[in-house]
Regions:
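NAD(P)-dependent Rossmann-like dehydrogenase/reductase catalytic/cofactor-binding core
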Residues: 1-244
């Protein structure tokens, strides 16, 4: 369950009210801001599952089923499989095109650094994922990225070339806020992971994810997102910077 579906489950009105309360309590010094789009959903009465409509339509007329995996092609060589690439944020080069997992920078920035076209993949869990978002520095690179993901039996989705993409930015910022919570004595790491897994239906907690990608990757990704977006709320928490 992703964050948007989760807000439908909780209730858009409940989620928006809590977000505003937390934001106001910290005088705006939070890792997030209440979203006007969510307020518009509340005003429209689209409260989520309980009202039959929220981000998604629960009237039974539509389906939010996962996409069907796309058939493999010759790029499905074993050394390119994500589980064979080692820890952290691995990368490969295919026909002069660099393919790497996002480290917070856009594909265009990565291409300037590499001096070559670049495909940037969003984070995904290799064992369970059925789809993956990616950005590319040009259309030729995008074609290679789509073919590679299809070879991995993942449905490829080209998305806007933004810092941190979608999943990685979301997970990194959740880990950032979780680090703040530990520093403030709200809970310890195990407690936060358990609360999000069993209370909010997360498949894993933010600290478990951070262990998988590495603390240095969390910090560098957040720094790149903060620089690329210009939003200070993405600046790494002292919890993470003190551990690298």
């Amino acid at each position: 369950m992703g964050p948007l579906e989760l807000t439908d489950l909780i209730g858009q009105d409940v989620n928006f009210s809590v977000a505003r309360t937390v934001y106001d309590s910290y005088f705006g010094q939070t890792r997030f801001v209440p979203q006007l789009l969510q307020g518009s959903l509340v005003d429209a009465g689209w409260l989520g599952r309980k009202s039959g409509r929220g981000i998604y339509d629960y009237s039974g007329k539509t389906s939010n089923a996962a996409p069907e995996p796309i058939a493999a092609d010759p790029l499905a060589d074993a050394p390119l499989r994500p589980e064979n690439a080692g820890p952290g944020m691995p990368h490969w080069e295919i026909g002069g095109i660099v393919v790497r997992f996002t480290r917070g920078q856009t594909a265009r920035v990565e291409a300037r650094i590499a001096g070559k076209p670049v495909v940037v993949l969003d984070w995904f869990e290799a064992a369970t994922a059925q789809a993956c978002g990616f950005a590319a520095s040009d259309d030729a690179a995008a074609e290679t990225g789509a073919r590679l993901l299809s070879a991995w039996k993942l449905a490829p989705f080209r998305i806007a070339d933004t810092p941190g993409l979608i999943v990685t930015r979301t997970l990194a910022q959740i880990a950032n806020a979780a680090g703040d919570a530990v520093l403030e004595g709200v809970s310890d790491e195990a407690g936060i992971d358990s609360a999000l897994q069993f209370g909010a239906n997360y498949p894993f907690g933010p600290f478990a994810w951070a262990v998988q990608v590495g603390g240095e990757a969390v910090v560098s990704t957040l720094q790149a997102i903060a620089f690329g977006t210009g939003h200070a709320m993405y600046n790494p928490s002292q919890y993470w910077t003190s551990r690298i």
